[in-house]
């Protein structure tokens, strides 16, 4: 195995609503995430006076970021993916003037990263938006939100033009099909036509952000971000193959629009077959032509699909509701572990788009135990990440242009799906439990030293292959 390229970016990925805390500090407004105390897979509910949402404090990154950045630098990070809390900059979402205290926080954060030699990769909207835009406008169902997002994007592009050169528009933009409130600010029971119209507005907003970035920051690069939910046919029946193709198109459609600049023909048919009419203006079509510079995505699992709906209805284990693959093992949360699938996905996306790729989320959520001596022996995490990185290396050998790899949750954080601390991803243990109890003390896990060695050797310390099929 060859070393990873010298230009390859190594690091980790976080999200503001899962690490920052300080949910109303320094003028921050209420975000949609603040109304999801049980996570993406829970229900939206009003704030209950005196009842704390675990994300209100999260891991207190807002106040402890210097300590955390120092730990990331100790591992050798060259890149850290973070998100800006939109409601920290525009508390209601529709203000003309931004909240200076919110802007100043990210100035301090980016300065700290620069001193540590870590490049920021910044997501504009990661599973949240100002709740004011939902309450007063109806979320992304309202075309007016496009303008408010563009104003926000232009504001942060201008403010951080000398500090940030890598941007992403919307985190896992295709998740709106599975979690409409999280993705586009719509009620979970919203109809399919309403969801796709809101998605259209978000795609236009993404393209406008790309256009603004290219205009204001000609040296910067801006990408999209997809949930990489690769689907296999359950059997070799042609009907299952066709069903898998259609399921993969459901999420790749977002990338097709963002990378190719127009709606693909298969979606036109989908809309016709489902009696969906997308209200699209001529200016929308022109805006969509502003395509992303690179494709970024998350990768956690694969699954199977069948043409037999009775089999599909019994799918379990995650928000994507894919049928378990009998040849794969699963995590404690039912997420199937498929390192080879990452190589397949990388090649699939490269063949489809011929644009640089960036793996901006990948990791293993697991329950960690603190030993009597205070150590955390997370060999299972090391095995998971080792085998996925081996496949990334194989994809590079295949000729795929890969910019970098940021593992999800380099430090334990509040999980998105169920707002749990017990579902841990990090190389760094944070002393906090699901009830919000704990000192928030940071402790290096065994995987901390392992990842540092991987980065130092540019992958030459990786070993083939430790996870085997049952």
UniProtKB/Swiss-Prot annotation:
GO terms for cellular component: cytosol. It comes from the Bacteria. Keywords: Glycosidase, Hydrolase. The gene is bglB. Disulfide bonds: none annotated. This is 6-phospho-beta-glucosidase BglB. It catalyses: 6-phospho-beta-D-glucosyl-(1->4)-D-glucose + H2O = D-glucose 6-phosphate + D-glucose. NCBIfam families: PRK09852.1 (NF007356). Catalyzes the hydrolysis of phosphorylated beta-glucosides into glucose-6-phosphate (G-6-P) and aglycone. It has a high affinity for phosphorylated aromatic beta-glucosides (p-nitrophenyl-beta-glucoside, phenyl beta-glucoside, arbutin and phosphorylated salicin), and a low affinity for phosphorylated beta-methyl-glucoside. One of its GO terms (molecular function) is 6-phospho-beta-glucosidase activity. It is an enzyme of class 3 (hydrolase). Signal peptide: none annotated. Belongs to the glycosyl hydrolase 1 family. One of its GO terms (biological process) is carbohydrate catabolic process. The active site is at 172 (proton donor), 361 (nucleophile). Part of the cryptic bglGFBH operon. Pfam families: Glyco_hydro_1 (PF00232). Its EC number is 3.2.1.86.
